[in-house]
């Protein structure tokens, strides 16, 4: 195994290395770099022939955040997440020693998959991050996200030679709670599994995407100041790990400057009670400070019978008491409306109204009526002037190969797409908070009010999705990593139950697909390019007691990134897997 490159920082130190274990199947040897723990982390992106700007650490495409050293917990380990290094690289406009933008990392492709990811192992805490953006010799268009798709920079278009900086403050958190205990993470489907989920994987990760993102460097500085929005909620507020779903909590950062920090501990399936039992509020209370805001948005799961009105109101009081005891402001948010809701007073089994009514009884509590705003918004979007699609904010995806885990598409009348999450966050940030008596306008990047009766045009909204949530790590040379997988229902014939897709290996063009459980019946295996083009297809009959499929006819595929989907008796066998040749 190759030893990773080390970078000497004064005082010298013996390099130790850490890995993110996306999938514990295979340890891979890639170049990795570790730097001595320090107060700030400053990186100069570019080519190896240019020396680093004084005070910065040079980073080139050779510096990969490897999974080969999973047992190390050394802060300062850094590198690029290597999902497809053919799509991005380094470029130099000169060797000036005092200009971070004279060389940079950028994407070569313009096909919608123009992304690269950079990760740094840092201690838990708040960090102000400054990005150095642009190309001295060409145009650039850059989007930036942090962790699990927290949106920071939106389509920053810079003219030839134009350079810019953007600064935000983000949180890196751990499940452990100061004083004892841990947050009860959701490991189902890998949602909050620290080996997969960017929000919980012990490092800060930034995603750069767009038509031509150009990043010359970045500063990461630990801070203890700022106003934090602590988010308590369910899947309508969570920072969704996987496309094409999204929620408003992931977009709030986009509209505020670095004085506002979002700490979103919402998680799918939670009620106002289970959020407490998973010690998520306890985690928030361990870091909440005077001047912070505690947001509460529940009701969707409470209304399904597990939490009565009286218990819901008692829970509201618990959250309120926690906020006031920390000299923070309590903000109750009515639960988002479903696409079929038209009456805000009865929406979500009356829990929107319960939230309104009980919030009025608590002194100093604020109310953001998001439920009513969503109903206005979807009504407006249904008008011809806005495209005539009232469901435009919800997660609908047509049957295609764009989403390999959704071969039949998606029709979700509860959860939101990226556009929906963006629109809701824009309304909360620009209008909802002010209407609730919370004046944070001086922290907004744009103070223009947002009217839910006059939403943005979805057709004019450009937003690249996060490729890392569609395709997980793949190593050079053909090794395959599986995505998180889940069992599906009984197949149509024979009653066999497809269990978990275990792994796929590639050796000189021959695929071996391993799966647990015993399957019988018709199997269909398809290989697609990242643009969705079918590259190969195999239909075969599975023999009883079989646990593996060999496929030797793929050695003609050109080098590139592909995904493979397996179906048995027309039922998808877990999620798709991705590989690189």
Language model regions located:
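C-terminal tail/sorting-segment detector
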Residues: 492-496, 537-542, 550-555, 559-581
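Conserved catalytic region of serine esterases and O-acyltransferases that act on ester linkages
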Residues: 38-41, 385-486
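Residue-level detector of functionally pivotal "anchor" positions at catalytic/ligand-binding pockets or at interdomain
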Residues: 482-510, 518, 533
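Compositionally biased, intrinsically disordered or flexible polar/acidic segments
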Residues: 38-243
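Conserved SGNH/GDSL esterase-like catalytic core that processes O-acyl groups on lipids
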Residues: 221, 226-318, 450-481
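Substrate-gating cap/lid alpha-helix
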Residues: 337-376
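Short, glycine-anchored, charge-dense loop/turn motifs used at functional sites
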Residues: 421, 528-535, 562
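Structural recognition of the beta-strand scaffold that forms the well-ordered cores
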Residues: 44, 228-233, 237-238, 261-266, ...
